């Protein structure tokens, strides 16, 4: 009987050591409270006028001049002189490029102001609302048509005209 108790005692000791060793060798590692932050940076979204703008005449605007100037990446000006009669028209094209590395751009339809609608019609034939420019080089054109719709009789007529296109970032 003593022998039996001795064998049982040895078995219990071996099992206890095995369980104890297993409990000591397991370690759980946790990571808590860490976070990743990605910040919006306006420098990641670059849509601008590209290269030189162009223009064409319609009608017979002899002696007319058009001056196009890009004052910076997002502002351009034009001056049209010498249009004289109904039907004289100038079409101006401003190339737009998306220089963003990873973001696409969605263009809104141009908004136009014209303070002399009696003598001048101004329309934007492009871009259409929702025009999407691919990242890293997608292009579109802002095309403006300025037309004399009534022949001036007694005084020279002028108009102050603006056009704006809003570009929104798209993933």
Predicted segments with their positions:
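C-terminal, structured domain-capping segment
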Residues: 88-108, 135-171
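Residues that cap or initiate secondary-structure elements
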Residues: 28, 42-44, 53, 100-102, ...
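Short, polar/proline-rich extracytoplasmic segments that appear immediately after membrane translocation
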Residues: 1-69, 170-171
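Surface-exposed interaction patch
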Residues: 17-18, 25-28, 45-48, 72-126
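Low-complexity "stalk/linker" and mucin-like segments enriched in Ser/Thr/Pro/Ala/Gly
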Residues: 45-48, 52-73, 116-137
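Generic marker of residues within folded, mature protein domains
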Residues: 12, 82-84, 132-136, 153
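Terminal low-complexity, poorly structured segments
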Residues: 7, 13, 64, 79, ...
């Amino acid at each position: 009987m003593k022998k039996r108790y001795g064998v049982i005692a040895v078995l219990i000791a071996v099992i206890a050591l095995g369980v104890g060793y297993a409990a000591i060798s397991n370690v759980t590692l946790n990571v808590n409270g860490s976070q990743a932050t990605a910040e919006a940076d306006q420098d990641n979204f670059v849509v601008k006028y590209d290269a030189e703008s162009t223009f064409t005449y319609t009608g017979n605007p002899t002696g007319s001049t058009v001056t196009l100037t890009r004052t910076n990446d997002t502002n351009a000006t034009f001056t049209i002189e010498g249009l004289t009669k109904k039907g004289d028209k100038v079409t101006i094209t401003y190339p737009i490029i998306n220089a963003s590395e990873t973001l696409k751009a969605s263009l809104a339809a141009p908004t136009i102001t014209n303070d002399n609608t009696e003598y001048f019609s101004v329309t934007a034939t492009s871009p259409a609302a929702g025009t999407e420019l691919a990242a890293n080089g997608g292009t579109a054109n802002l095309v403006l048509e300025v037309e004399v719709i009534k022949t001036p009789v007694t005084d020279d007529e002028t108009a102050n005209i603006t056009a704006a296109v809003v570009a929104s970032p798209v993933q």
